[in-house]
Amino acid sequence: MEKFKAAMLLGTVGDALGYGNVCRENSASGSIQEELQKTRGLDSLVLSPGKWPVSDNTIMHMATAEALTTDYWCLDDLYREMVKRYVETVEKLSEHRPDPSTIEGCSQLKPDNYLLAWHTPFSEKGSGFGAATKAMCIGMRYWKPERLETLIEVSIECGRMTHNHPTGFLGSLCTALFASYAIQGKSLVQWGRDMLKVLPLAEEYCRKSIRHMAEYQEHWFYFEAKWQFYLEERKIREDSEVTAVFPDNYDAEERDKTYKKWSSEGRGGRRGHDAPMIAYDALLASGSSWTELCQRAMFHRGESGATGTIAGCLFGLLHGLATVPPGLYQELEHKGRLEDLGTALHRLSTEEK
C-alpha cells in the first residue's frame, strides 16, 4: 500500500518539478538547475503549493483515480463517471497551463447523454501527452495479469475520451501497462517489449469497438514503429537482451537532442509516444536514484511536466519514498487526497470487480 501512496505523491512531485522547470525556462528568473546549484540541491527544496503548483497532468490523473475508486457497477458506468469528472475538472484548468488537446477533447464529451457520453470523434489534434499522464492509476487499479483485458479496454477508452488519436490513446495504454508491470515486479528492461506484445490485443479491441477504424489505421503503426526504434537504440528489443545501452556522452545537452529526435514536433515529450518513452528512458538510466531521475525526466527542455508526472509515479511504484527528500512531498498540493487515492486504489486492486 505504501508504494501506491508513493506513486500518487511522486507523480505529483514530478509534475510540480517539471512544470516549474517549464515555467522558469519561459521566464527571466533562470532555470531550476541554476536555482538548485545555489542551494543544497533537491534536499533543500520544499514544494509548497504557492511556489510549486501542479499542472493539469496531476488534476486529470486525480480525476481518473477518483472515478476508478467509485462504486461503479460496470465499465460503462465507470466511463460515465470519468466523463462527469473530466468535464467538471477541465472548467477549472485555465490556471494550470492545460494541454490544448485535453481541453478540446473534453469539449466533445457529453455528460448528460447516457448512451453516448464518452463517444468522441477521431481527432487529428488528439496525439498529445495528456492521455498518457492521466492513466498510470488504471494500471494500479488493474495490475494483476488476469485483469489485462480490462486494463486494455479502460486505458484505451479513458485515453480516447480526451485524445481520440492512436498516438494519444496508445500513450494511456502504455503508462497503464508500465504501472502494472512495476507492481508485478517485472524487470524494467522487459517493459517496453512486453508493451509492444500487447499492441495487437489493443488493435483487436479497437477493431471491435471503433466504428470507423480506417481513419485510425494510418496513425496506428506510428506509435509502434517509434517504440521499436527506441528499443533497438537501447539494445533491449529482444528477450535475450537484458541491459539497456546508453551513449558514452549522454549529458543534459545530448539528452535534449535525443528527446527532440524521438519527438515528431521538435519538443521532447509533446506526444503520446514520447512522453512515456522519455520517462522510461530516465527510469532505465537512474536505477534507484531519485536525483538522477529528476535530471533526466523533470529537468529537460521539453514537456518536463508530462515526463516528470509519468516517471515520478512509476518510480514510486518501484522504489517508494525512501530515497526522496521529504521536503518534496510533505507540503505538496493535494497531498491528503493523493494519499487517500493511493490507499483506495490498493484496496480495490486486491478485490475482484
Curated annotation (Swiss-Prot):
Task: List the record's Gene Ontology CC terms alphabetically.
Answer: sarcomere
Q: Name one GO biological process term.
A: cardiac chamber ballooning
Q: Which InterPro entries match?
A: ADP-ribosylarg_hydro, ADP-ribosylglycohydrolase, Ribosyl_crysJ1, Ribosyl_crysJ1_sf
Q: Which UniProt keywords apply?
A: Cytoplasm, Phosphoprotein
Family to which this protein belongs: Belongs to the ADP-ribosylglycohydrolase family.
Indicate yes or no for the key word Endoplasmic reticulum: no
What is the role of the protein in this entry? Required for myofibril assembly and outgrowth of the cardiac chambers in the developing heart. Appears to be catalytically inactive, showing no activity against O-acetyl-ADP-ribose.
Q: What is this protein called?
A: Inactive ADP-ribosyltransferase ARH2
- Where does the chain cross the membrane? none
The molecular function terms of the Gene Ontology recorded here are: ADP-ribosylarginine hydrolase activity; magnesium ion binding
UniProt keyword DNA repair, yes or no: no
UniProt modified residues of type Phosphoserine: 27
Q: Which organism is it from?
A: Rattus norvegicus (Rat)
Q: Where in the cell is it found?
A: Cytoplasm, Myofibril, Sarcomere
